Amino acid sequence: MSLLQFSGLFIVWLLATLFIGTLTWFEFRRVRFNFNVFFSLLFLLTFFFGFPLTSILVFRFNVAVVPAEVLLQALLSAGCFYAVYYVTYKTRLRTARAQAASSGGGLFTMNRVETHLAWMVMMAVALVSVGIFFMHNGFLLFRLHSYSQIFSSEVSGVALKRFFYFFIPAMLVVYFLRQSSRAWLFFLVSTVGFGLLTYMIVGGTRANIIIAFAIFLFIGIIRGWISPGMLAAAGVMGIVGMFWLALKRYGLNVSGDEAFYTFLYLTRDTFSPWENLALLLQHYGDIEFQGLAPIARDFYVFIPSWVWPDRPHIVLNTANYFTWEVLNNHSGLAISPTLLGSLVVMGGVWFIPPGAVVVGLIIKWFDWLYERGNHEPNRYKAAILHSFCFGAIFNMIVLAREGLDAFVSRVIFFMVVFGACLVVAKLIYWLLDSAGLIQPRRRRAAPLSPTETL
């Protein structure tokens, strides 16, 4: 990449970043938080944060990258995608009166006991899954020699990892029932502690830690306990923390220029794998478009082999197609194609505009559900709605990094398990109530004041 090419790319990157950043800032000033703000920040992080890191790698360490014209196509594709997404998100599908008329009632309600039972069931799902996985494998972080081994046949019970995450929605219910600064700090300590435990047991998976910390920060923004400046500082600390965990995961011991180089490429690959989109565009002529099949194939991993004995052992979703067919990488790891990359694999660049419309509608639905929780008079139902919305933040990160096919399968799995936990909680409540074990809460007598006597 020449200096002239870099200058052109920098101008496009700066304009696109200012465009998305300005819209996001106005939305933040208007509502402080919604899922459009979150997705916009996530989109900026995924497709634009990595450009400065790539530039330093090129000019400081002479790292080879794809041609500048392909990088330009990647930046323009991301900018155009966001423009279509934003118009879709801002398009009102119904009148305000119709939206208000549909905001009452609802199909379900929650009482105090059912809500507490719900978070206990979700926590039990997570803890039992972790316990069974640990009994089969021990602490994989200290047993395995490379991170790719966690996907090998040496590790059993891999499907259980999908249930670990439900510890976070459980703690979200606990927080939203109280919404105090003490409950907020308890959420951080409990979820990050659980994330560190799963990091050691699974052998280096950092997702639970990242998600817990991100939710903690956004709750702080909503409540006014964290300023945007504090959020930026916490983000820097988070990046450094994730780099340290990555070093431990891969067993790297680096210093000096090597440490700086390692920090740049690990941070880029962790937070902003935008070059993967450029790689797909570079090999565009070699891609056999997969259509919508990757969305269906991604559900295969949730089907037990005893239910489907002939289930394919290799799932050709967009991430695996990108890893095996484009990169010719058969190390056992699946490399993230990004949201736009998954659309390119499925249908080429013509899938990007309709994909942006679909994503806009998805984020619009989550914001509608979030607003329902904000205006819900039943605090227990509101806690469940907010727990569901914030718990789905992980799936939105999957959407931006892994692609639309991975998002669809994971969000449906999350909805099914979350809903099943609510059904189990209601069933337990019904059994307890039928046995006469549920008693109405008695109002406590007001304590005597120091001047009152019996």
UniProtKB/Swiss-Prot annotation:
Its main location: membrane. HAMAP family: WzyE. GO terms for biological process: enterobacterial common antigen biosynthetic process. It is found in: Cell inner membrane. GO terms for cellular component: plasma membrane. It comes from the Bacteria. Probably part of a complex composed of WzxE, WzyE and WzzE. Keywords: Cell inner membrane, Cell membrane, Membrane, Transmembrane, Transmembrane helix. It is a multi-pass membrane protein. This is Probable ECA polymerase. Probably involved in the polymerization of enterobacterial common antigen (ECA) trisaccharide repeat units. The keyword Cell inner membrane applies. Belongs to the WzyE family. The chain crosses the membrane at residues 6-26, 37-57, 63-83, 122-142, 157-177, 183-203, 209-229, 230-250, 343-363, 380-400, 411-431. Pathway: Bacterial outer membrane biogenesis; enterobacterial common antigen biosynthesis.
